[in-house]
Amino acid sequence: MQIQFHLYNTLSRTKEVFNPQDQANVKMYVCGPTVYYNPHIGNSRSGVVYDLLYRIVIKIFGEKAVKYVRNITDVDDKIIDRAALLGVTIDELTDKVTKEFHKNMAYLGCMLPSIEPKATKHIDVMIAIIERLIAKDHAYIADNHVYFDVLSAPNYTELSNRNLEEMFEGVHVENSKTKKNPQDFVLWKPAKQNESANMNFESPWGLGRPGWHIECSAMSYKYLGENFDIHGGGADLIFPHHTNEIAQSRCAFPSSTYAKYWVHNGFLTVNGEKMSKSLGNFITVRDLMDKQIQGEVVRLFLLSSHYRRPLDYNDKAIEDAKKTLDYWYRAIENINVQKIDLPHDFMQSLLDDMNTPLAVKIINDYAKGVFISKTEEERQLNASAIITCANFIGLMNKTPHEWFNSGVDELYVNELVNKRLEAKKQKNWLLADQIRNQLLEEKIILEDRPDGTTIWRKE
């Protein structure tokens, strides 16, 4: 029986059965970071959501059949401005932030994409597409800029499902007397005086750099061709970025449909408010790493809500994710777990538009099953289901001992435990209690066993 994967398509505004153009060559493109500032937790949601989608598609079609492209935007006005502010070169800034992004993705347990192209390495492809658009009267040169003629694009509003006036309400539009229409967007912009040379490139229109939207059209075309299966990104990219991508790609290649399925993850707020530097609630992934919050905790938090729904970051949500993982790890402790086939109900939850809240509930049910099981066989079966399901969504990649003792100096704790055992042998109960209390203050819990040994764990 063929697996049916239902995925919500923003383009049709319905859940559709995912049917790739070629099951032996499934193609997926996701908008990656603009590397001017350390990624924030909103960026990380996109990383985790599309990592899960990648895992599901691999499960269905096989790893060799799936090509996942996630770009790096390393040419942008924001990059120029921040490099100038910090007094560093463009390359120094983009290299540093790109490395930080990779560390963040590893911390969150994300698999590497098949290809991770950088915009600056694909300027030739962008220029070639812009030339096609000019030749087909979809773009024009004005005041040393190249603009895309929005009114020349059929079905421009299809993705956003709004009329043109509504789409541009409240959106900053760079005005120019030389534009045909206020809504026309830039494909190529000229270099400014005193700008860094490595942020500008030679072109038929003079020294300059590409607009943001053309970058993704070029890189997706280079690695996936005119048509591909999935295009992912945050809901904030529906307009203008993805809308403009579709317009310029379809106009450059009239026989193409561009991406077949458009997938968008919801917004992330902090304590109920939009995240912003001015509100002082801008949280980077590095902030979480520095607080020694384990990556699995953040990943589970990001998967705790359906990917299309808004998600609020707050201390309680992180605490709840930690408690859930503690419960799961405690459930498999001291049990000989084995990898088994993915349980049917768990897989079905993910095949229904990546219903992660239901998937998490199913793992919780297996954990509960461990604690109420009457036989060792039942306990082992439930524990094996926990680890199999959790591993599939990128969780529980540690042993229970590693999990509960993460960040603990084991040599130090073991030394105190042995010192306490010696004190008990000498019937020095005062010292034994002092050591127990000292460790308790450091959130280390001791458990004395009937055989005279003592085990410990982090609270």
Swiss-Prot record:
Single GO term (MF): cysteine-tRNA ligase activity
Cofactor note: Binds 1 zinc ion per subunit.
Motif 'KMSKS' region mapped to chain: 274-278
Catalytic class of the enzyme: ligase
Cofactor(s) essential for the protein: Zn(2+)
SMART domains reported for this sequence: DALR_2 (SM00840)
EC number: 6.1.1.16
Residues annotated as binding ATP: 277
Gene Ontology terms describing biological process: cysteinyl-tRNA aminoacylation
Subcellular location as annotated: Cytoplasm
Pfam families noted in UniProt: tRNA-synt_1e (PF01406)
CC per GO annotation: cytosol
InterPro entries listed in its UniProt record: Cys-tRNA-ligase, Cys-tRNA-synt_Ia_DALR, Cys-tRNA/MSH_ligase, Rossmann-like_a/b/a_fold, tRNA-synt_1_cat_dom, tRNAsynth_Ia_anticodon-bd
Annotated residues for binding of Zn(2+): 31, 216, 241, 245
Known catalytic reactions: tRNA(Cys) + L-cysteine + ATP = L-cysteinyl-tRNA(Cys) + AMP + diphosphate
Main location: cytoplasm
Family, similarity comment: Belongs to the class-I aminoacyl-tRNA synthetase family.
Xref: HAMAP family: Cys_tRNA_synth
Name listed for the protein in its UniProt record: Cysteine--tRNA ligase
Organism annotation: Rickettsia conorii (strain ATCC VR-613 / Malish 7)
Organism placement in taxonomy: Bacteria, Pseudomonadati, Pseudomonadota, Alphaproteobacteria, Rickettsiales
